[in-house]
């Protein structure tokens, strides 16, 4: 089996400055891939740059916001992903408590369609802020796995416990590490992790 080094910059479309930086890196062949964040403010511009440049682009599946002052809006309008009509949840806890899996799934499709409808081929998927990795206690990872399988997309998913420790800023408890192995195994059996 051949191995390839992929150097990916995610959050393409996050803001005009980041979009410009990633575009320059792609044009300069300093990175080999990017992941477009369709709910972010500069997403349409990033998609156009990707189309014009023929860039390898993934969908950076995002169901939360990073901006509490100007919250991002979902692409699907799924009600359970929006906090009191203000936009996507900033809080991982709020998202975990309120998001419905059918709304998560609808949002994943809407984000894929945002990119593909602009003439850009989506070649992989990954996730913003680990919201689809199962560490929030929700089974959104199943929705992500099924979505990727249906679209024949590889899914970038952390396979080592070191990722978990960095996410929670301490050594991950044994039960969490065990759960992560189960989630990784499920993805590997589906063939998209």
Say what each PLM segment does.
Residues 18, 43, 104, 108, ...:
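Aromatic/hydrophobic pocket-lining residues that form the small-molecule binding cavity
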């Amino acid at each position: 089996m051949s191995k390839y080094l992929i150097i990916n910059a995610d959050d393409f479309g996050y803001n005009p400055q980041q979009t410009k930086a990633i575009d320059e890196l792609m044009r300069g062949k300093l990175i080999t891939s990017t992941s477009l964040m369709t709910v972010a403010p500069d997403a349409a511009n990033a998609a156009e740059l990707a189309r014009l440049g023929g860039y390898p682009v993934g969908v950076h599946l995002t169901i939360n916001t990073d901006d509490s002052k100007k919250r991002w809006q979902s692409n699907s309008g799924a009600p359970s992903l929006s906090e009191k009509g203000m936009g996507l949840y900033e809080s991982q806890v709020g998202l975990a408590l309120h998001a419905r899996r059918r709304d998560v799934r609808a949002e994943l499709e809407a984000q894929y369609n945002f990119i593909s409808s602009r003439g850009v081929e989506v070649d992989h998927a990954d996730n913003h802020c680990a919201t689809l990795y199962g560490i929030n206690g929700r089974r959104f990872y199943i929705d992500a796995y099924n979505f990727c399988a249906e679209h024949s997309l590889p899914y970038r998913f952390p396979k080592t416990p070191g990722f978990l420790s960095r996410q929670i800023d301490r050594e991950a408890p044994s039960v969490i590490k065990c759960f992560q192995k189960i989630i990784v195994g499920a993805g590997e059996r589906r063939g998209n992790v």
